[in-house]
């Protein structure tokens, strides 16, 4: 059985060689994620070119995702290495560029003294250390240690419950975004999204560069959770970034928020990735914990489009095993749940949405061997995918970039074909491609969804039941 949920792999030192990339793709990688928090453009370009070459050599439509760092708040560097802070210690965080020690450290975020008030909590290193702000003096935030531990260079700071005034896009993010648009990435992810209008900042730059790519919102701030429906509407997809989200929200809320995001994304035909610590123990062990296996399985059974590996594939000791393990878990979960995925109660709001819903229902009634979408933008395929039909979903497109973009969407297998001007020619393309590949046989029924006339994005208006091998003539 073909796996329907997609696998996103973060690339890094453990997986940047051509040999490792080939193994990753063979093991099941559908999307390669580039974490632009690390490395430089030259290094990333080298790996990007390798991904494209290896994927083309293997005949696989692997998508490539550029993940922008966003306004991540970090401490600076410590002059003599890590220091230990104990309960009750006074510790200062300053915007001055000073070497860190047991009494103070600098921060990358110049707006910290303006955002923090006495009594606010500051979390360090994903909440491993907890500080309470006691006063603000100019560019210095004085804190008292509530939960101590080791603190070292460049550790992250989280400010739960605080409205951070940092911009949606930093100068570094803008430079990285322009580079990614010019390089040829398939998708962009924006970190620390707080409001729907954050999408406008990125799209304005896309407009300047004359490149429009799908934009994913990473949900990792409580402010974003408060405005989920609007953010899902404003962006082209969502990543449930459970690392920072689990630090800033009560831990017990994360699974509930995750399921809510998946449901909202299915309603709006937006792809959704569940990310962070999915098989975390496999960074250093060849097998995951039972809890991790359950985590992946339930994300798949809840209807996520994709599940993601981070450190497991970027710096872990078992990157290939992590992908093959995730592949096996997802397949097993789908074998159990494919016919039992929650149906969407909400009726479609557009003509294209109504036709996609009808196609899924007609396919089940006539015993179709495939649901086929002809698409210029990928939207028709995404609308079909949200119904999670057990019938294989095949997308045909003449737009090469759409193949990479649909690599993130549940269940979609994409074929690149020449553009044709008539719907009957589309049907001939389907027959020729799928008979040659041995995917279908004469007499098989398929349900075809397309726009007429062909070539107009967003014009889905036709549904057709076709028997493979039957005569097709121009009308």
Segments and roles (model prediction):
Residues 1-475:
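Non-catalytic helical/linker scaffolds that mediate oligomerization, partner binding
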């Amino acid at each position: 059985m073909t796996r329907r949920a997609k696998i996103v792999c973060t690339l890094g030192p453990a997986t940047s060689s051509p040999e490792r990339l080939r193994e990753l793709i063979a093991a099941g990688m559908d999307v390669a994620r580039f974490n632009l928090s690390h490395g430089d453009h030259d290094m990333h370009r080298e790996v990007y070119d390798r991904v494209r070459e290896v994927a083309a050599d293997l005949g696989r439509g692997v998508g490539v995702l550029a993940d922008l760092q966003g306004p991540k708040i970090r401490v600076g560097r410590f002059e003599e290495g890590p220091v230990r802070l104990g309960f009750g210690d006074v510790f200062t965080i300053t915007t001055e560029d000073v070497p860190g020690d047991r009494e103070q450290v600098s921060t990358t975020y110049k707006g910290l003294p303006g955002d923090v008030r006495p009594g606010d909590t500051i979390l360090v290193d994903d909440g491993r250390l907890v500080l309470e702000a006691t006063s603000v003096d100019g560019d210095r935030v004085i804190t008292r240690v509530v939960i101590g531990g080791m603190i070292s260079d460049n550790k992250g700071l989280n400010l739960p419950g605080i409205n951070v005034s940092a911009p949606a896009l930093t100068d570094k993010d803008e430079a990285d975004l322009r580079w990614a648009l010019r390089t040829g990435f398939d998708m962009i992810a924006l970190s620390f999204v707080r409001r729907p209008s954050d999408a406008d900042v990125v799209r304005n730059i896309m407009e300047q560069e004359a490149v429009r790519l799908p934009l994913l919102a990473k949900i990792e701030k409580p402010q974003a959770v408060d405005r989920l429906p609007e953010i899902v509407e404003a962006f082209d997809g969502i990543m449930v970034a459970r690392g920072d989200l689990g630090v800033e929200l009560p831990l017990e809320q994360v699974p509930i928020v995750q399921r809510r995001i998946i449901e909202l994304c299915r309603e709006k035909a937006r792809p959704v990735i569940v990310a962070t610590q999915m098989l975390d123990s496999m960074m250093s062990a060849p097998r995951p914990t039972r809890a991790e296996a359950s985590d992946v399985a339930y994300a798949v059974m809840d209807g996520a489009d994709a599940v993601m590996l981070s450190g497991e594939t970027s710096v872990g000791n078992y990157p290939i095993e992590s992908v093959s393990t995730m592949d096996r878990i997802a397949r097993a979960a789908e074998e159990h749940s494919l016919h039992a995925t929650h149906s969407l109660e909400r009726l479609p709001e557009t003509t294209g949405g109504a036709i996609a819903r009808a196609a899924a229902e007609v396919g089940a009634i006539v015993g179709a061997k495939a649901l086929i979408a002809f698409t210029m933008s990928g939207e028709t395929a995404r609308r079909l995918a949200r119904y999670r039909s057990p019938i294989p979903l095949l997308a045909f497109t003449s737009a090469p970039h759409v193949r990479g973009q649909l690599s993130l969407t549940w269940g979609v297998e994409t074929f690149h074909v020449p553009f044709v001007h008539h719907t009957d020619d589309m049907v001939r393309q389907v027959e020729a491609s799928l008979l040659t590949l041995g995917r279908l046989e004469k007499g098989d029924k398929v349900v075809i969804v397309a726009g007429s006339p062909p070539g107009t994005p967003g014009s889905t208006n036709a549904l057709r039941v076709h028997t493979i091998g039957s005569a097709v003539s121009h009308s």
